Amino acid sequence: MLVFKKSALGALLCCFTLPVLAELPTITVLATGGTIAGGGISETKSNYVAGQFGVDKLVEAVPQLKDIAKIKGEQIVNIGSQDMNDQVWLKLANAINQGCSGSDGFVITHGTDTMEETAYFLNLTVKCDKPVVMVGSMRPATAMSADGPFNLYNAVVVASDKNSAGRGVLVAMNDAVLDARDVTKTSTTAVTDL
């Protein structure tokens, strides 16, 4: 009888789990580089080079993402955000506008130096009504206390939420969600800089 109960429970869980998995939203992660993809020579040193890891490595660093969304990754560029320019902005806007029908939301990994400019530009040029959420970090991916994985997880949660649709471009960092027009970098070193 105990075997039957375990089998019945397993079948029941299977039947209820599969439909939930099938309903996970598809989120496209568009990677541009920045500190969130940065790498240093040591976990304890503060020097690093931005844009050292691609979108696949960023997503792999947060295995819990598979529980909240189906992730598609696209590497737009892999640069420090001080090198961001209008050509990259247009490429991002086009990727979102053209990919709108195939995704339930978008997350853009980005450096914080020019995140506010990119967010504002995309807020004006993206015509997709799906959630668009920008995310970055103040510590590189190789740092002992990297904030990127937590920020990326939260950005995917926000992009997966249907209530985020139609709100323009959002920025999710440090347990906060901001509108593109309200984002300002206030410190070059503080983790809570936006």
Across the structure, where does each feature detected by a protein language model lie?
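Bacterial N-terminal signal peptides that target proteins for export
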Residues: M1-A11
